[in-house]
Amino acid sequence: MIAISPDRLAAIIARREELQAEMARPDLDSNRLVALSREYSEVEPVALAAENVGRLREEGETLEAMTKDDDPELQAMAVEELEANKTALAEAERALALSLLPRDAADERSAILEIRAGTGGDEAALFGGDLLRMYSRYAEEHGWRVEMISASAAELGGYKEVVISITGAGVFARLKFESGVHRVQRVPVTESGGRIHTSAATVAVLPEAEEVDVDIDERDLRIDIFRSSGPGGQSVNTTDSAVRITHIPSGIVVSQQDEKSQHKNKAKAMKVLRARLYERERERLHSERAGQRKSMVGSGDRSERIRTYNFPQGRVTDHRINLTLHRLPEILAGPGLDEVISALIAEDEAERLASLDD
């Protein structure tokens, strides 16, 4: 566990008191007050955690002295309470260390989730549909709102590609480790011989970006308007309402045709474009820091095989943390996914805490 010195604890608490004093000044202008309030909201929980650590350390020192008391009964009581104190202190120091870690600025954001069928043809598309249901139900369990942005349905069911937005507090923090290749092993409905096939789908989770996050020059966009088409290429709309936006500098292309309104299709396409550009910048910054910390959990490489869903064995294995759970139905149903995600978050926290020791 990270050893946090008494001087550092005192400095954290002192900074909170400095902020309180400055915010109480009558001559403080509103812009400065907003900035100080934002810092205070970040410092206050850390200061409370620091005070808790300090209190438990003092309590531990007192109990340690009592274990040497001449009274055997008092000594025995102190030994027992000291064990409880050590456990509480370890938990408090971990909580404080976690609060001191740099936060991912995108954690509290909503997210754009994209699923694309990979190897496996029709079976991969069906699996893409399974993943969509899993994430949609997981979102519902957490009280988040799911909105379909675009979908390319496959003829036998499922999706060749589907994009949804998931809106709520902390969505990205919970789902960001889902990016990567998800593999399924099962007997396809089209398989008459009963042989197990392996198929795959790629998941990408992007933090939702606001207009202020990404500066997009209209002159960098090429916008094409065309007629919507359904499976097999048949026209599904008599008006030119589908929109394709190309961001020329990056080469990113986003198409949207699910809405009957050209205006709504353009708005949805811009939402996805902003998210992709924002994520590209995040990836650039991440790669610059990659030499400082190699993460097994949060690499975010979408070509990395991260998880296998084995139907014959009822097994789900996350390869990044060697986690295997024989609870496939519950996980694909949505609620069971929490156990996997919580394990990934715990591993990421452990890695980041260890990096503070380096």
Curated annotation (Swiss-Prot):
GO terms for cellular component: cytoplasm. InterPro entries: PCRF, Pep_chain_release_fac_I, Pep_chain_release_fac_I_sf, Prokaryotic/Mito_RF, RF-1. SUPFAM superfamilies: Release factor. It is found in: Cytoplasm. Disulfide bonds: none annotated. The modification N5-methylglutamine is found at residue 234. Methylated by PrmC. Methylation increases the termination efficiency of RF1. It comes from the Bacteria. SMART domains: PCRF. Residues 283-306 are annotated as: Disordered. Keywords: Cytoplasm, Methylation, Protein biosynthesis. GO terms for molecular function: translation release factor activity, codon specific. Pfam families: PCRF, RF-1. Coiled coil: none annotated. Gene3D superfamilies: 3.30.160.20, 3.30.70.1660, 6.10.140.1950. Peptide chain release factor 1 directs the termination of translation in response to the peptide chain termination codons UAG and UAA. Belongs to the prokaryotic/mitochondrial release factor family. This is Peptide chain release factor 1. It comes from Zymomonas mobilis subsp. mobilis (strain ATCC 31821 / ZM4 / CP4).
